[in-house]
Amino acid sequence: MEKFRGEQYITETGDFLNGIDHEANEKLNREIVDLRSEECRVKIGEKTDPAYNNPDKIQYIYNYLEQGGAELKDVRKDIIHKNLATAAIANVLEKIPFVRENKWGNDIDSYLEIFRDKFLYGKDQTDSQPWHNQRGSALTFLTISEAEDLSVFGKNGEILSEGKYPTMSGPLDESVFDEKINGLPLTEIMIQEKINNGVDKATAIEEAEKRISGVREFIQAPVTEKFSDVIRHCADSLGIRERVETVNGLSIDHLKRVAEKENRSIDDMLVMSFGCGTGLATLKMLKKLKDETGEAPTVILLDQDPLSLAAAQSLAKKWNLEDKIEVHCERLFSKLGKPLSLEGVLGNRKLDIAEDSGLREYLPDGVYKQLTRESLKFLRTGGLMITGNMNVNRPQKEFLHGLMGWVPKVRMRSIKEGFKLLQKSGIPKESIEATVTASGVYTVFAIET
């Protein structure tokens, strides 16, 4: 990865999110300077997202969300004051690893949803529930990733701008419900997954049907002008799209380099995405690589959500990539947080790339290190691990769990913490190269074995 070693990366600094959040910008640049003084390799990503062509809109959305966040705090304070016992329990439970949601937290959140709905979607068009109901699910990233290509609708249902996709689900349509996972119908495997997690059959059926109904609404829901502005220009959306672009760029460069250096066919290479969600990012990488070279590696898509994997299969078929994916629906972590043993998935195969860039920010430090060690065991010599984390010093950090209301809780970390956790997992500092996205929201770590 010689491209990271140039002198330019020693001196460059960032104006993250165009320098709008001055405090975050200063803290991130200080972090980067300090790490480089310790001979850590840190690169700043380029501003390639189309949103950067409209800096005034980025500034406007930043200010708009700051105002909304302040108003939401006042609403929340009032709710907590009236429900002190409920709030205290919710605050304790949300700090416990792998507790995704709880009744008390949901009660408070339901009060706030009315405000979020009006503020994010538009006060005259309060129908963002189809998207908000998918929070915590990888399906929401379909909306964010494809924001530039979504049609936008006005108050009376008229089309303000016609995009490639008519609804907030982007490339995903109702064909997803026809997918089978491991030969079983989607509904059946969703029910079985819940039963395996201790839910009784009647409740499992009810929850699966409710989830499918919610996804169906999501697939049919339009995008309003206000919501479009937010998902195109807010820091979090920029960060997600930049993370995808960074990961895919690293992956494509690595596979091409290995093909040339080792005289191997890219078709024979193996990539794994651990916690892949809908697989949209990985499928985009496959499509781009195949368009450029005529070849693409086999990708193992590993996730515990059957519906997300069904979405991945459906998207792969649309892009004629179904013969390049291998889907595994497995529980990723035990109840105590131990990562899935990859031997059952990989057997004696070795990986050219192990990627989990959207997962680590949900993991406690101990589980983070266990996952690193488990993935390293199955990487080829000269293989590449790609991971990442949301930055603690990122711009507009309170938006994610505030106005957006994202669940579960994200563990934002400093860039230095990322380096330390990887080093404590047995990776030499010299093997780690970090890219901080231009928005300052994420850091992507590339580790070559």
What function would you assign to each model-found segment?
Residues 336-348:
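Short amphipathic alpha-helix with an adjacent loop that forms part of the alpha/beta core around
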Residues 265-279:
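Conserved class I S-adenosyl-L-methionine
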Residues 268, 350-351:
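Local beta-strand N-terminus motif with an aromatic residue
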Residues 361-363:
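A short His-aromatic
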Residues 4-97, 108-109, 140-144, 212, ...:
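Class I (Rossmann-like) S-adenosyl-L-methionine-dependent methyltransferase catalytic domain
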Residues 120, 124-186, 193-200, 205-264:
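Class I SAM-dependent methyltransferase Rossmann-like catalytic core
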Residues 369-381:
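A short glycine-rich, Lys/Arg-flanked "PGG" loop and its adjoining helix->strand segment in the class I
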